[in-house]
Amino acid sequence: SLTPYIQSAELDWQVPKGSWKVLFFVCAKDGDPNADYLDPEAVKLFVKETHQAYYDRFADDFGDAIIETFFDEPTMYRAEGRMWTDKFNEKFRVRYGHSPELLYPALWYDIGEETQSARNRLFGLRATLYAEGFMKTIQEWASAHGIYSTGHQDQEEIQNPVSVAGDLMLCGKYMDIPGIDKIG
């Protein structure tokens, strides 16, 4: 990692002999108005503004007329399949015991023998953060309010859901009534 060589937003590094490709990765906001689905605290704020507002107004109907909460097509793809969170590196270190910084090129390039393992760890953690950050947070809120959680992911029919929902089975683990969208 060249991070120690960055001072005042400038890279001060003596390039060793050889052929080099320097890659710079940042976690940037892209203007998407959705909550950070990978961050349970952000999702809790979303739930406070939405679900809790309904509960505050219709608490007597929860568990009777209102038996479930429903979400429709949350997705990581709105960020062109690159949804990330600024807490990712920290959570990666906790889970795997090292920084993910040197693995990021594997998202776009073959980095050698470790390419597949790096992708599995990076995308695997992102899938876990998504399922636990969004689905689990919604499910816990619903359970605490006497209703079920249900809904469905965006594009659950595609063969490779990594950029959309991460891991569909993991998402379903945190839904009381997992759903799919069958149109047509």
Question: What residue spans do the PLM features occupy?
Answer:
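Secondary-structure transition/capping motifs at alpha-helix termini
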Residues: 59-61, 139-148, 170-175
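Generic recognition of flexible, low-complexity loop/linker segments
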Residues: 11-12, 55-58, 136-140, 165-169
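Substrate-binding cleft/loops of secretory-pathway carbohydrate-active enzymes
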Residues: 74-87, 150-184
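Short, basic, glycine/proline-bearing loop/turn elements
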Residues: 121-125, 180-181
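Weak global preference for isoleucine
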Residues: 6, 15, 66-70, 111, ...
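Aromatic-lined carbohydrate-recognition surfaces of secreted/lumenal glycan-active proteins
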Residues: 67-73, 126-164
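Mature extracytoplasmic enzyme cores
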Residues: 1-120, 127-129
